[in-house]
Amino acid sequence: MKLLKGLPVAKDVRVAIVGACFNAPIADRLVSGARETFFESGGSPDSLTVVRVPGAFEIPCAIKKMLSKGNLFQAIVACGVLIQGETSHYEHIADNVAAGIARLSVEFCLPITFSVITAPNVEAAWERAGIKGPNLGASGMRTALEMASLFSLIEKE
């Protein structure tokens, strides 16, 4: 039996982080967590691109534009923060952002991780940004690196 499993190693891996600016203090923490994890995993500054968009809804469109430029990245980490309000706006945005990212990942056969916090309130969002527990941006980067490594192994088969 052959087992293929990726490793969270960033050496020679080109990665992009697409981070929403809305809910900036929390979103910035996700982007920082992803960036720090990339460098801790052996990545070089020349191999990392950070793109900031106004809000989470703009993430899939920015990713699609980046991917239309060719094979520039081996993985993408999507970071954003959506906090539930009193209307259904939150559900519409969360559903469409998640579906858009998933669709692009499959369409381009590229690891695109969903490090978008969907929280009922600000306190819960901060917890998911690493205040009490793991930083979703950091875990998204680890997953992206593992998947990029796995895809490389699969291509060599």
Swiss-Prot record:
Q: What is one GO cellular-component annotation here?
A: riboflavin synthase complex
Function of the protein: Catalyzes the formation of 6,7-dimethyl-8-ribityllumazine by condensation of 5-amino-6-(D-ribitylamino)uracil with 3,4-dihydroxy-2-butanone 4-phosphate. This is the penultimate step in the biosynthesis of riboflavin.
- Give the binding site residues for (2S)-2-hydroxy-3-oxobutyl phosphate: E86, T87, R128
Q: Could you identify this protein by its name?
A: 6,7-dimethyl-8-ribityllumazine synthase
| Keyword entries, A-Z | Riboflavin biosynthesis, Transferase
Its pathway is: Cofactor biosynthesis; riboflavin biosynthesis; riboflavin from 2-hydroxy-3-oxobutyl phosphate and 5-amino-6-(D-ribitylamino)uracil: step 1/2
**Family matches, as Gene3D superfamilies:** Lumazine/riboflavin synthase (3.40.50.960)
Q: What are the BP-aspect GO terms?
A: riboflavin biosynthetic process
UniProt xrefs under InterPro entries: LS (IPR034964), LS/RS (IPR002180), LS/RS_sf (IPR036467)
